[in-house]
C-alpha cells in the first residue's frame, strides 16, 4: 500500500511538472531582477572577423537575444532554429547576437577564422550561414569573462542549482550565477535592461513564445501610454 501511495504521489508531481530533474531543479526560464543599475548599452564587442567593434547601444530600441554558442555541441543544431527565429521576429525588432566560447566541454576549439567554415561544412553543415551577428570567441564565465556577461548574469537568476561536472567546465572561480552550458540565452528589452534568461535545453520554440508574449505586453503598455 505504501508503495502504491508513493507511486501515486510521484505521478501527481510529475503531471504537475514539479519533479526535479536528476541534475537538480532546472527551470526553463527565469525572470531578471528589476533593480540593477546600468544597461547593456554601456558595453560592446568585436565581430568574429575582428574588424569591427560594435557598441550595443547600436541596438537601442530593439529586443536583443544574447546566446553563447559552440560548433561541436549536442545543441549546435539550435543554430538552425535561431536562424528561423531571427527571420521570423527580426521584422518585429528582435536582434540575435552569438558569442562563441570554449569553456563548456572544449566544444569551440577553433580559431575565430575557423568557426564560420565549421558551421557551413561540418555542423550544422549543408552550407549553413548564420543570419545573425557572431562575435569573437571569448569567456562568458570566470576571471576573464567579458564584462557584458558579468552584467547579464548579475541581472538574472541562474536557471539551475548545479553547475555540472567540473571536469567539463573550464573556468575559475566558479560562481552561482555562472552560465551552465552552451546555448544559454538572455533577452534584453528595448530599454537595455535584461528581462529573461533561459536554460540551455529550453527549446527555441519555447523561447520564441516567451519573447512574443513579452513583445505583446510591451506593445500593450505603449498603447496605454499613448
Swiss-Prot record:
| A Pfam family per the record | GSHPx
Keyword Signal among UniProt keywords? yes
Q: Which CDD domains match?
A: GSH_Peroxidase
Compartmental location? Secreted
Q: SUPFAM superfamilies given for it? A: Thioredoxin-like
The alphabetical list of record keywords is: Oxidoreductase, Peroxidase, Secreted, Selenocysteine, Signal
Main subcellular localisation: secreted
Name this polypeptide is given: Glutathione peroxidase 3
GO MF annotation: an example: glutathione peroxidase activity
**Source organism of the structure:** Mus musculus
Active-site feature positions: 73
Q: Name one GO biological process term.
A: response to oxidative stress
Q: How does it assemble?
A: Homotetramer.
Q: What gene does this protein come from?
A: Gpx3
Q: Where is the signal peptide?
A: 1-24
- Reactions catalysed: 2 glutathione + H2O2 = glutathione disulfide + 2 H2O; tert-butyl hydroperoxide + 2 glutathione = tert-butanol + glutathione disulfide + H2O
**What is the purpose of this protein?**
Protects cells and enzymes from oxidative damage, by catalyzing the reduction of hydrogen peroxide, lipid peroxides and organic hydroperoxide, by glutathione.
Q: In which tissues is it expressed?
A: Secreted in plasma.
How is this protein annotated for GO cellular component? extracellular space
What class does this enzyme belong to in the EC scheme?
oxidoreductase
Q: What is its EC number?
A: 1.11.1.9
Q: Does the keyword Phosphoprotein apply?
A: no
Please give the family membership noted in the entry: Belongs to the glutathione peroxidase family.
**Gene3D superfamilies, per the entry:** Glutaredoxin
Amino acid at each position: 500500500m505504501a508503495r502504491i501511495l508513493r507511486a501515486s504521489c510521484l505521478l501527481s508531481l510529475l503531471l504537475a511538472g514539479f519533479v526535479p530533474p536528476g541534475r537538480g531543479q532546472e527551470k526553463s526560464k527565469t525572470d531578471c531582477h528589476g533593480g540593477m543599475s546600468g544597461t547593456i548599452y554601456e558595453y560592446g564587442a568585436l565581430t568574429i572577423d575582428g574588424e569591427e567593434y560594435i557598441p550595443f547601444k547600436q541596438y537601442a530600441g530593439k529586443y536583443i537575444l544574447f546566446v553563447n554558442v559552440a560548433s561541436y555541441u549536442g545543441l549546435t543544431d539550435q543554430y538552425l532554429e535561431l536562424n528561423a527565429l531571427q527571420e521570423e521576429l527580426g521584422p518585429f525588432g528582435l536582434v540575435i547576437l552569438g558569442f562563441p566560447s570554449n569553456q563548456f566541454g572544449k566544444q569551440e576549439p577553433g580559431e575565430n577564422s575557423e568557426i564560420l567554415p565549421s558551421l557551413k561544412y561540418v555542423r550544422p553543415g549543408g552550407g549553413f550561414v548564420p543570419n545573425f551577428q557572431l562575435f569573437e570567441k571569448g569567456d562568458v564565465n570566470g576571471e576573464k569573462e567579458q564584462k557584458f556577461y558579468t552584467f547579464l548574469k548579475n541581472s538574472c537568476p541562474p536557471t539551475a542549482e548545479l553547475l555540472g561536472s567540473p571536469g567539463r567546465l573550464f573556468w575559475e572561480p566558479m560562481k552561482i550565477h555562472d552560465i551552465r552550458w552552451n546555448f544559454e540565452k538572455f533577452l534584453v528589452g528595448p530599454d537595455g535592461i535584461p528581462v529573461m534568461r533561459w536554460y540551455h535545453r529550453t527549446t527555441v520554440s519555447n523561447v520564441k513564445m516567451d519573447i512574443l508574449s513579452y513583445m505583446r505586453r510591451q506593445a500593450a503598455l505603449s498603447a496605454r501610454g499613448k
